[in-house]
Each structure stands twice: as structure tokens, then as C-alpha cells.
Amino acid sequence: GYNKSLRYSRHAGTSCLIDNQHYKQIASNGKDVRRKDRRISEAKYAPLKDLANQYMVTEDPFRGPGKNVRITLFKEIRRVEPDTHKLICNWSGKEFLRETWTRFISEEFPITTDQQIMNLLFELQLRPMQPNRCYRFTMQYALGAHPDYVAHDVIRQGDPYYVGPNQIERINLSKKGYAYPLTCLQSVYNENFDFFFDEHLWPYFHRPLVYVGMNSAEIEEIMIEVSVIFKIKEFAPDVPLFTGPAY
């Protein structure tokens, strides 16, 4: 369309059609076309989506209806060797491979009113202790272990998978066909904390054996925070107290 030999000369630039303004126009045309295209496809799929929304099931129970009540069991630092997995909780008696339990968050069970426990989630938060270490956390877990099975403290990595986004992993402990009978756990939790898990949780939920490692080639120090999250449906939900000049 134009003389190619004049392409790089200064004074012949005015006759060239493709300048910056022209590029801008092309770009905005493209954007316009894309926007209209998106609107058309949205209008096309909207009734289908409305229909699908009626049958939608939340995949992750953590996101579902209900309230999440967390009890942090412990927070500690462990050294993990390469190509091995370390057991986090062996649930034998009161000790989780440790002498004392640290109960963070609250001294008593935070659930007071009549509440139905829909689900129990085992949550794991992992953090590297040294800065600038580039490795990913791996884990393996078993749910249906025999109650008398004595788990090994350290195992070789079998087929691990990478710990989920944000270095947080949640394991759903619900057993199929088991409903949880108690509606008020606070008294039970307070009077015998030592037997709380054995007597009141493990008959109705899976008891997880969780192993954690990483794909680094050196010994790494890992900060492990373990908590149990109760998924709760409230019969008497919390109502905000009215405060103001009229009350």
C-alpha cells in the first residue's frame, strides 16, 4: 500500500496509515467485538445456568452452609528428612507424639447452644521455618485405620500428593451413614478432655493418620499447625444484640 523504501525515513511518515492512533482504533474495535461476543454467550447460557443452580452441590464442605468452629490442637516445629513422611497425629491417648497439648484459641469448647454437628474437618497448616526455601509440602493420609493399629512415626514417601493452595489442607472426616448424636459438646469437652476424642469423636468420625513431608533434598524445619474444625448447624443462631438510644 505504501513505498517500503520510505518506511524508515523521517519526513515521509505522515503519509503512512498505521500510526499509534490507528492502532488504538484497531484495539478498541477488537475489545468491542469481544464484549459483544461475551454478552451473546452469556445470554445464550443464562437459562441453562439458572437451571443448573437449582441442583448445585458445593464440592468443598468447608464452603457449604453452617458455621466453622475451630479448635487448634497444637502448633510446633518438626524436622523432616528428605524422601520421608513424618506422622503428625497418632491419637494414642492424650499425646500426639508430644508431652503437652497447647490449646490456643479458647480454654473451653466454644459451642454453647443447641447445635448439630454436621461435619468434622481436620485442618493442617504448614509453613517453612527458613526464608527463601523453595520446596513444596507433600502429604499422605489414611482414614479407615484399625483402632489398634500402631502407626510408624516415619515412613518413606509412597505416592504423596502436594498440599493444597496456601499450604493449607483440610481432610473431611465424616463417616457415611453416621449421624452425630450430641447437641451440646461443651460440658463433655470440659469434664474429660483426655477422653474427649476417643469417647465422643472417633465412634462417629474417621480417625485420620496424617503423614507430612516435602520435596526438598535437605532436612527442613517445618512449622505445623493442627486444628479440628467443627461444621455446625445452629438451631439457635447468634442474633446481634440491639444497642442504641431506643433500647
From Swiss-Prot:
InterPro entries named in the record: Polyhedrin
GO annotations of cellular component type: viral occlusion body
Pfam families: Polyhedrin
MF-aspect GO terms: structural molecule activity
Keyword Transcription regulation: no
Keyword terms: Viral occlusion body
Role of this protein: Component of the virus occlusion bodies, which are large proteinaceous structures, that protect the virus from the outside environment for extended periods until they are ingested by insect larvae.
Family note: Belongs to the polyhedrin family.
Protein name (database record): Granulin
